Amino acid sequence: MSDSDTGRASRLVVAAAVLDNLEHPTTLLCAARSYPPEHAGQFELPGGKVEPAERPEQALARELDEEIGLSVRLGPELVVPRQLAVAAPPNNGPGDDAPAWPAMHGFRMRVWLAEPAHPGERGRAGGDHQRLEWVRLDPPDQLRRLPWLEADLPIIDAFVVRLGR
């Protein structure tokens, strides 16, 4: 039985729903993967792995800077619904005690809303992402039209509900 089958997963990853503006959002930053081949071109929320002894929020800021060259201001966490939540394992890292979204390969993912630290910053593709797109939030089904990684679909649905769209 895998970790995800038991309701627990091991490694924590973090991602951000980067909005153009947290107060009055009109667009969301969506990142198309470069690899592996079976996921190339599929979209995800940008982020990455939390290193040992690193707080999730610190990891997210570091990963966004490294992966897409974007400094952000974090907003609230997008809380996972209880029926989808994956519990933190015993001996988890600092700040890693919250339930998380199930992610690919048995990882657990926590997601925060965010906005660019410097208005007008757009980020850059490269490395893990072949392209970045700022997608309009209206109409709400526009986000669902993108070819998302399967694990990100429930997160996108919860995000749209959170925005009340």
Language-model segments: residues:
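Conserved Nudix-box catalytic region and its N-terminal flanking loop in Nudix hydrolases
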Residues: 24-67
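Active-site-adjacent beta-strand/loop module that shapes the phosphate/pyrophosphate-binding cleft
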Residues: 11, 82-122, 128, 133-140, ...
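Residue-level signal for short segments within beta-strands and strand-turn junctions
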Residues: 18-20, 32, 115-116
